[in-house]
Amino acid sequence: MDKHFFSKINLDIISDTKELYIGYSGGPDSTALLHYLNSNLDIKLTAVHINHGISDRSKNWEKHCSDFCKQNKINIICESIKIEKNKSIESEARRLRIETFKNIVPTSAHLVLAHHLGDRVETLLYRLFRGTGIKGLSTFSDQAKLGTLKIIRPFIKIEKSEILNYLNEYNLSLIHI
């Protein structure tokens, strides 16, 4: 594996806690993150899988995540959310995920998300095309606070292609949506 990949991962931002909760969809980004943290940190990890229930395959995805965590000896919490039909699916799903994370993650722990460099660029372009002001053009950083919830993004300088290479290197199974 390319040493440059590992040098871009900022684990220093994780040093002030003994427990991490990882947002885990089972997709490529969160699978690579969960595997990487489990392989490189001696810290209690808990994966959090949120079942949106918007696909016929949602239960299969949840089972895949549970099985992956069991095989890798990682704690997992699976939560189901219900998105109201008259609301925007994307914004309502985001709101409910944040609410779920706030309810699950204790204040002594941190939430770790697998946002990567491509997500950062995508967010910037989305905000730019929406006509946001200068302040709105700043994208997310490697650390954030949402009330008492501390969010960590150690992959923020990693490109998607590097994540895919990591998955191939370790032959990790994931969900293809």
Name each model-derived stretch.
Residues 1-174:
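Core alpha/beta nucleotide-donor-binding catalytic domains of modification enzymes
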